[in-house]
Swiss-Prot record:
It comes from the Eukaryota. Pfam families: Xan_ur_permease (PF00860). The gene is NAT4. Belongs to the nucleobase:cation symporter-2 (NCS2) (TC 2.A.40) family. The chain crosses the membrane at residues 42-62, 69-89, 91-111, 131-151, 157-177, 186-206, 217-237, 282-302, 359-381, 388-410, 420-440, 457-477. GO terms for molecular function: transmembrane transporter activity. Keywords: Membrane, Transmembrane, Transmembrane helix, Transport. One of its GO terms (cellular component) is membrane. This is Nucleobase-ascorbate transporter 4. Its main location: membrane. Highly expressed in the root central cylinder. Expressed in the filaments and stigmatic papillae of pollinated flowers and developing siliques. It comes from Arabidopsis thaliana (Mouse-ear cress).
Amino acid sequence: MATKTDDFAPFPVKDQLPGVEFCVSSSPNWPEGIVLGFQHYIVMLGTTVIIPSILVPLMGGGDVEKAEVINTVLFVSGINTLLQSLFGSRLPVVMGASYAYLIPALYITFSYRFTYYLHPHLRFEETMRAIQGALIIASISHMIMGFFGLWRILVRFLSPLSAAPLVILTGVGLLAFAFPQLARCIEIGLPALIILIILSQYLPHLFKCKRSICEQFAVLFTIAIVWAYAEILTAAGAYDKRPDNTQLSCRTDRSGLISASPWVRIPYPLQWGRPSFHGSDAFAMMAATYVAIVETTGSFIAASRFGSATHIPPSVLSRGIGWQGIGVLLNGLFGTATGSTALVENTGLLGLTKVGSRRVVQISAGFMIFFSIFGKFGAVLASIPLPIFAALYCVLFAYVASAGLGLLQFCNLNSFRNKFILGFSIFIGLSVAQYFTEYLFISGRGPVHTRTSAFNVIMQVIFSSAATVGIMAAFLLDCTHSYGHASVRRDSGRHWWEKFRVYHTDTRTEEFYALPYNLNRFFPSF
């Protein structure tokens, strides 16, 4: 039989990702949307619990303080998610706690001035106030970058070639929170990973699940099955004589968090007292905000793909960064001990479920606010073993990385210039970040150790982020390497994104990114 010519035709380039069930501006029915929103809430719980669990004990807090901080993070995350989806980027992203702020928060926590406080609760409050003050000051620079259009100017020079490493490393850069955390309780984490892959990838093709139920709710089914399995192991005494670290990772009866959580409590601004302000703390926290801006940009680009929207215009992206800065301000006012970012795991969930609806994410924000107020119910869900979340991350982070790989369809991969920029930026991003992170864990300080401790922390924060290092390398090389050659513009894919550089150039932009209530008249995008 003769070979068809179509078999050798290249796959067409798509401005919008096909195969998505619900795009940014469309919505599922309410029952389905509520379940999908609850699923987003469950997925973001892992990061919400991990960061306070690291910081609060070091700050001097106990189970009560940890429960209060977790509920505060949930409450502020719900508000930030609503603000971002309504007035910011308008993309279906969940705004939550960011790992980028861990290093400056630890720098403040271990500051010598807090050693004078002997009472743990008093030391916790004083440390929290210092972190709050640093977040408030850092949020100002964050908002300036967004609302004054400084970030818009920079991202206009992004091409698909330089954006690909950014999005790839936004997903891959968090690999330390995936399988290494799964392996802490392999008998729970590995079954969760296998079940999730079977439910989401194989079962839909074997049984032809109606309306992609297997794909859309695979995360909820996986958590329910493996959590019940973990409950059985815990009740059977499988971990009674195991080391404390194993029990912490595997057991489901972490009663300290549940008993410490109040039935009803509404977080409020300045609940820990008046923030304190120190210049070195603020500069260290500013570095974290810039890293969060970079990583959020990667999540925004991935979310626009998974939501079947057109490429996000620089002005809209900058607007979203500005509202993220307002979110960091709220983090500082309420006292969450960390800033906000677009959560990578929830962005990956858009790809897994093929549901990029804005309404679903807004519903998830409602769950965040509800469970933050009624703390006992939220604490029960927060007791899900962390290796189960790590199993989810193995798939969800990979989806975000795949969104970055998808941008390469706009580029000429036969160009040796492109091969070098792509390969080098990904490699150097992972390599430098791993070096800085390992150096910190082995020696207790970063490789940069000058007399100015704040500068050392700034360098550690920036170069511990694979996405930040990768985009710096890719952006610099793409804008300087053979830039004057006639073929470079097409090879890097700039001509594909040219029509999205200005807001009104493409008619589809208004459908996905226009502000509600006709607010574009008063706050125009350019």
